[in-house]
UniProtKB/Swiss-Prot annotation:
One of its GO terms (molecular function) is DNA binding. GO terms for biological process: DNA-templated transcription. It holds the Pfam family RNA_pol_Rpb2_1. Belongs to the RNA polymerase beta chain family. InterPro entries: DNA-dir_RNA_pol_bsu_ext_1_sf, DNA-dir_RNA_pol_bsu_external_1, DNA-dir_RNA_pol_su2, DNA-dir_RNAP_su2_dom, DNA-dir_RNAP_su2_hyb_sf, RNA_pol_bsu_bac, RNA_pol_bsu_CS, RNA_pol_bsu_protrusion. Coiled coil: none annotated. Its EC number is 2.7.7.6. The keyword Oxidoreductase does not apply. The RNAP catalytic core consists of 2 alpha, 1 beta, 1 beta' and 1 omega subunit. When a sigma factor is associated with the core the holoenzyme is formed, which can initiate transcription. This is DNA-directed RNA polymerase subunit beta.
Length: 1343
């Protein structure tokens, strides 16, 4: 396998046995693709903005003489780029311009002649744009729109599982769910009548819906029942016989024909009887006249002479009616065929409870149910019913809904519209009745074929459509008002409702979330999150266990491991590593196609619906070199996702990868297969909380997923095109692009500006560090600079730490850990946190607030860190209470005391009419000011500091652009020089000339002269573009800022805090093994091995067996082996051994077992490359053990041997304090440890006095409110148990809510009088008031 220049720097040894058929797809596809579909023009108008416009336009006036037509739209370029929007606190968005056409028709003309057409472009608000990394910048903060898993539109058949009725009878129901519009439900009641509900309102007999569709009783019966025909022949009654219908019934008379008795009376009719009847072709039997009694007529029987109805349709036949029918001359009678077994009389029974008799009365009934209290008219009731299900404007099943509907009811694919038809409704009722009759079964709602993903684009489109519909109403009103001569489309459209709808969605929707930016993994997982909550989804309280459970259709689509603990468990999921959504929004996962027992390289994506009919083998099935299954029986998933053993020739597909089942976070856990699922869940979740350390350290034991996550997260800088590094410093990298990758006529220079020390959403530090050197050859897609938590383009969330599993004097009781002081000294877990504090100067009623260094009653020392504008210097070290920005607020006129008047008279007008409202550092925070930004409103004079910052920004912008220009010019002039020299010019002569003169030379060769002229033009273009860019930049910087109403100035101060690790901080491994640091121990007291090397962290071995996360032990062993090999390489480098020895040792390590997917051949490496590789392997050979396909025990032992270590993985340790040997060998190795964002500094908090709650007068709770500690019920019991009455009394009175008592107490303490007078706690008064509010008088009797 060929390695690029930077990949050769450090190669991870892969233990995977199976070749990688499919690389992990780009991880942010779900977000980017969805939004692209929303924004890009779709010529078919099926999706995105185009679909929204086409669904609302044209808007026709009520009189029909004018209409507003939609032509097309365009998005403008955003004013500021992403970075500028973040700094300014604005939204990264593009203006939407829509071309509309107002057409008015001639009222006089009969043939709709066009009278006038006006066309112009209308501004319709702003659409937030997605950044390259799948996020949105809204008001300066990065947000993510989480995809939603909701119930797919279509028809669903379900049952109440016997929970509704006390008898336990199972009631079936059907529900038609459109994409938008009214829901239609059908349900059985305990009496087996069929009812319908519209939008979950009051239920009506289902036949009312059929009558409203225009069906008569007779037609309704014809739709749902088979018939039995009776013939009256003299005094005999003959029945047409369909033998199959008799199965299971008991004969109430002898069934005989042609003198042969087939079934005797009272006998149950069996299959044998039916066979005999069918064999003899018996089509009619004589039945006693009692047999027809109680049967139901299928149509109206009318006495033709008198016109009297003898027996109505759905009426029962009695002896009397039978006689009347015979008398009226009817010889055949049709009745409905029903039985108790599988042909129930449900519709017939329902017609009996149906109060309506024709279409109008049915429509009235529906109108009364939908609009109670309004009198129905024929027109209004008809219009209401038609609008419910048969109007494309109000009702849409959508393509997905229609597809699901047709599949459920076995209609041909692709037929039917977005609205319902009569056939659709009847088919649903028929299927529901069939299910009640025992044919067919109900759907599984949690099946992923019944739930679909709704992503950003689709949700944004829905919001946009809501805004458009609001606009449509207003436009219709305007159009009908008349006087259209003076009106243009511009006047008709008010963009406010549209921008409000869009803004509300992006700003405050439940699914628009503040991006989790702790580290690259948390960003990627947040964007791949799938939530069942949100608008149109479930709610936490209502969701039961079934919805939250892992379903077998989740396989390869949703991760069974990664989900939050707590109330949202199972409702928020994560996309599996290879999953994607299809056009309908259903999740699909890739499989390798199997043909006749041979696995091909062909890959197909299948959704759950498609997958149902196939047998699919697992990814770890054994294959021979011809890709055929070696086992006689293969474990595979068959019907309904149940696994079983199948013959190789029966198998249709095979999984693509062993990591296919889990999400990216779970795929980062090595030896996941040896961890208990609950702990793996914690491990996957805690990796997202790891804080980026000062120096990222790649994991020694990884899974091979580290690289794709780091690259796809967008935190690292990746080369867009290949080339050579021409310039590199801490803040920018310049690449001279390879000739073959440049476009003709461009300079071929790529400039990458790096992000330096910026604050993330979680206050961690984002910083990019170059990892290439001058002159390095670079390929497209290679890493140029590492971001937070990345190391040479690999995800590096924590540090490799030498750990020992042993108890140590109780310091690792209950999951706590003992940490060596060396870890602190080496800054292994030191992190940088950046806080943003802002100070806002507003225009108040009493006058404007002012930012100034002249603050009343503040000493010189407090102002020492401020400049003359009253803003802190960059680089100042500040602590809690220090002033960062001086600000004064005008206060109202106050009555002056005579003394003040005197002082005023002597010293003149003192600035006493302002109060100090400066921005101070919050208590308990300290740090260094790393940046200050000043935003000034348009029209307000800028202060000195703002001008300095502006000047600095201009200088930097100019420097950036000048450098860019110089580099581009250098590239261009190099080409000019080559051209001139190739045409015979003298190089020495050329170099004496000014470069711009080169362009004025003439060349005899015409083609070369043309090239030179082209280059001269390009030079001119470059200069012009430089001037233009500089001017644009200058305008942006000088321009006043767009601040909120009433705000004059905003100053933002950024503080950086360096936090070392300390007792109380939370740490964790990757296997859910979390704990708190109990003590930082001196190095000399830590246990050490025979070489005198101390361990860095001591973990409790009791945390392993009960939690069943054995993966951590295997990781520790493999980590030890990897480090051992690193030590051997280090020793060889120190002894300066020849390269060949190094090469063969490293080759041996790579060739050792495993490596199914990757063979490393060091013979193709130059000596220099081998040495560079060895230098990077000094700290240990990084290994990858992919999930479910990792290293096994034998391989770990071999690797330990190669590293010259005991194969048990256990080492004799000595006590650092006494030097004595511990009783038995201890498991020592290297584990990857993370520092989580739960730092004791953020949690520690103390209060003496502070704010109190308004009603109860008790101290508030929580650090944010500077609250007290709650002395709760159980604590009270504890003091009661000790009999500490006085302590308890002060807890419940003066230390809590006895207002007078605590004031007196304070006075007493001040005056040195240690005395307490408790009174009545305020909460007693509150409870008395509450009881009185119930109308019960309650008083406290003073004794």
């Amino acid at each position: 396998m060929g390695y690029s220049y930077s990949e050769k720097k450090r190669i991870r040894k892969d233990f995977g046995k199976r070749p990688q058929v499919l690389n992990v797809p780009y991880l942010l596809t779900i977000q980017l693709d969805s939004f692209d579909k929303f924004i890009q023009k779709d010529p078919e108008g099926q999706q995105g903005l185009e679909a929204a416009f086409r669904s609302v336009f044209p808007i026709v006036s009520n009189n029909g003489y004018t209409e507003l037509q939609y032509v097309d739209y365009r998005l403008e370029e955003p004013e500021f780029d992403v970075r500028e929007c973040q700094i300014r606190g604005s939204t990264y968005a593009a203006g939407l311009r829509v071309k509309l056409r107002l057409v008015s028709y001639d009222k006089e003309s009969s043939s709709r002649a066009v009278k006038d057409i006006k066309e112009n472009e209308v501004y319709m608000g702003e659409i937030p744009l997605m950044t390259d990394n799948g996020t949105f910048v809204i008001n300066g903060t990065e947000r993510v729109i989480v995809s939603q898993l909701h119930r797919s539109p279509g028809v669903f058949f379900d049952s109440d599982k016997g929970k509704t009725h006390s008898s336990g009878k199972v009631l079936y129901n059907a529900r038609i769910i459109p994409y938008r519009g009214s829901w239609l439900d059908f349900e059985f009641d305990p009496k087996d009548n069929l009812f319908a509900r519209i939008d979950r309102r009051r239920k009506l007999p289902a036949t009312i819906i059929l009558r409203a569709l225009g069906y008569t009783t007779e037609e309704i019966l014809n739709l749902f029942f088979d018939k039995i025909t009776f013939e009256i022949a003299g005094d005999k009654l003959l029945m047409t016989l369909v033998p199959e219908r008799l199965r299971g019934e008991t004969a109430s008379f002898d069934i005989e024909a042609n003198g042969k008795v087939y079934v005797e009376r009272g006998r149950r009719i069996t299959a044998r009887h039916i066979k005999a009847l069918e064999k003899d072709n018996i089509s009619q039997v004589v039945v006693p006249s009692e047999y027809i009694l109680g049967k139901v007529a299928s149509k109206d029987y009318v006495d033709l002479e008198s016109g009297e109805i003898i027996c109505p349709a759905n009426g029962e036949i009695s002896l009397e009616t039978l006689a009347k029918l015979a008398q009226a001359g009817y010889t055949t009678i049709e009745t409905l065929f029903t039985n108790d077994l599988d042909y129930g009389p449900y519709i017939s029974e329902t017609l009996r409870v149906d109060p309506t008799y024709d279409k109008t009365s049915a429509l009235y009934e529906i109108y009364r149910m939908m609009r109670p209290g309004e009198p129905p008219t024929p027109e209004s009731s008809e219009a209401l019913f038609n609008n419910l299900f048969f109007s494309a404007e109000r009702y849409d099943l959508s393509t997905v809904g229609r597809m699901k509907f047709n599949r459920s009811l076995a209609f041909p694919e692709g037929e039917g519209a977005g609205i319902l038809s009569n056939e659709d409704i009847i088919a649903v009722m028929r299927k529901l009745i069939d299910i009640r009759n025992g044919r067919g079964e109900v759907d599984d709602i949690d099946h992923l074929g019944n739930r679909r993903i709704r992503s950003v684009g689709e949700m944004a489109e829905n919001q946009f459509r809501i805004g458009l519909v609001r606009v449509e109403r207003a436009v219709k009103e305007r159009l009908s008002l008349g006087d259209l001569d003076a009106i243009t489309p511009q006047d008709l459209i008010n963009p406010k409702p549209i921008s409000a709808a869009v803004k509300e969605f992006f700003g405050s929707s439940q699914l628009s979330q503040f991006m989790d930016q702790n580290n690259p993994l948390s960003e990627v997982t947040h964007k791949r999150r799938i939530s069942a909550l949100g608008p149109g989804g479930l709610t936490r309280e209502r969701a039961g266990f079934e919805v939250r459970d892992v379903h077998n259709t989740h396989y390869g689509r949703l991760c069974p491991i990664e989900t939050p603990e707590g109330p949202n468990i199972g409702l928020i999921n994560s996309l599996s590593a290879f999953a994607r959504t299809n056009d309908y929004g259903f999740l699909e996962t890739p499989y390798r196609k199997v043909v006749d027992g041979q696995v091909t390289e062909e890959i197909e994506y299948l959704s759950v619906i498609d997958e149902a009919n196939y047998i699919i083998a697992q990814a770890n099935s054994n294959l021979d070199e011809n890709n055929r299954f070696t086992d006689a029986f293969v474990t595979a998933r068959g019907e309904r996702g149940e696994s079983g053993l199948y013959k190789p020739e029966d198998i249709h597909y095979m999984d693509v990868s062993t990591q296919q089942v889990v999400s990216v976070a779970a795929a980062l856990i090595p030896f996941l297969e040896h961890d208990d699922a609950n702990r793996a869940l914690m491990g996957a979740n805690m990796q997202r909380q790891a804080v980026p350390t000062l120096r990222a350290d790649k994991p020694l034991v990884g899974t091979g997923m580290e690289k794709p996550i780091a690259l796809d997260s967008g935190v690292a800088v990746v080369a867009k095109r290949g080339g050579t590094v021409q310039y590199v410093d801490a803040s920018r990298i310049v690449i001279k692009v390879n000739e073959d990758e440049t476009i003709a006529g461009e300079a071929g220079i790529d400039i990458y500006n790096l992000i330096k020390y910026t604050r993330s959403n979680q206050n961690t530090c984002i910083n990019q560090i170059p990892c290439v050197n001058l002159g390095d050859p670079i390929n497209r897609g290679e890493v140029l600079a590492d971001g937070p938590s990345t190391d040479l383009g690999e995800l590096a969330l924590g540090q490799n730490i030498r750990v020992a599993f042993m108890p140590w004097n109780g310091y690792n009781f209950e999951d706590s850990m003992l940490v060596s002081e060396r870890v602190v000294q080496q800054d292994r877990f030191t992190t940088i946190h950046i806080q943003e504090l802002s100070c806002v100067a507003r225009d108040t009623k009493l006058g404007a607030e002012e930012i100034t260094a002249d603050i009343p009653n503040v000493g010189e020392s407090a102002l020492s860190k401020l400049d003359e504008s009253g803003i802190v210097y960059v680089g100042a070290e500040v602590k809690g209470g220090d002033i960062l920005v001086g600000k004064v607020t005008p206060k109202g006129e106050t009555q002056l005391t005579p003394e003040e008047k005197l002082l005023r008279a002597i010293f003149g007008e003192k600035a006493s009419d302002v109060k100090d409202s400066s921005l101070r550092v919050p208590n308990g925070t300290s740090g260094t000011v790393i940046d200050v930004q000043v935003f000034t409103r348009d029209g307000v004079e800028k202060d000195k500091r703002a001008l300095e910052i502006e000047e600095m920004q201009l200088r930097e912008a100019k420097k950036d652009l000048t450098e860019e220009l110089e580099i581009l010019e250098a590239g261009l002039f190099a080409r000019v020089r080559n051209l001139l020299i190739s045409s015979g010019a003298d190089a020495a002569q050329l170099d004496k000339l000014d470069r711009t003169k080169w362009l004025e030379q003439t060349i005899a060769d015409e083609e070369k002269q043309n090239q030179l002229e082209q280059l001269a033009e390009q030079y001119e273009e470059l200069r012009k573009e430089f001037e233009h860019k500089l001017e644009v930049k200058r305008k942006k910087i000088i321009k006043g800022d767009d601040l909120a109403p009433g705000v004059l100035k905003v100053v933002k101060v950024y503080l950086a805090v360096k936090r070392q690790i300390q007792p109380g901080d939370k740490m964790a491994g990757r296997h859910g093994n979390k704990g708190v640091i109990s003590k930082i121990n001196p190095v000399e007291d830590m246990p050490y091995d025979e070489n005198g090397q101390p361990v860095e962290i001591v973990l409790n071995p009791l945390g392993v067996p009960s939690r069943m996360n054995i993966g951590q032990i295997l990781e520790t062993h493999l980590g030890l082996a990897a480090k051992g090999i690193g030590d051997q390489i280090n020793a060889m480098l120190k002894q300066k051994q020849e390269v060949e020895k190094l090469r063969s040792y490293i080759q041996k390590a790579y060739d050792l077992l495993g490596n199914g997917s990757q063979k490393v051949d060091l013979s193709t490496f130059t000596d220099e490359e081998v040495l560079r590789l060895a230098g990077n392997l000094r700290k240990g050979l990084p290994v990858a053990t992919p999930v479910f396909d990792g290293a096994d025990e034998a391989e770990i032992k071999e690797l330990l041997k190669l590293g010259g270590l005991p194969t048990s993985g256990q080492i004799t340790l000595y006590d650092g304090r006494t030097g004595e040997k511990f009783e038995r060998p201890v498991t020592v190795g290297y584990m990857y440890m993370l520092k989580l964002n739960h730092l004791v500094d953020d949690k520690m908090h103390a209060r003496s006095t502070g704010s109190y709650s308004l009603v109860t007068q008790q101290p508030l709770g929580g650090k944010a409110q500077f609250g007290g500690q709650r002395f709760g019920e159980m604590e009270v019991w504890a003091l009661e148990a000790y009999g500490a009455a006085y302590t308890l009394q002060e807890m419940l009175t003066v230390k809590s809510d006895d207002v007078n008592g605590r004031t007196k107490m304070y006075k007493n303490i001040v005056s040195g009088n240690q005395h307490m007078e408790p009174g009545t706690p305020e909460s007693f008064n509150v409870i008395m008031k509450e009881i009185r509010s119930l109308g019960l008088n309650i008083e406290l009797d003073e004794e």
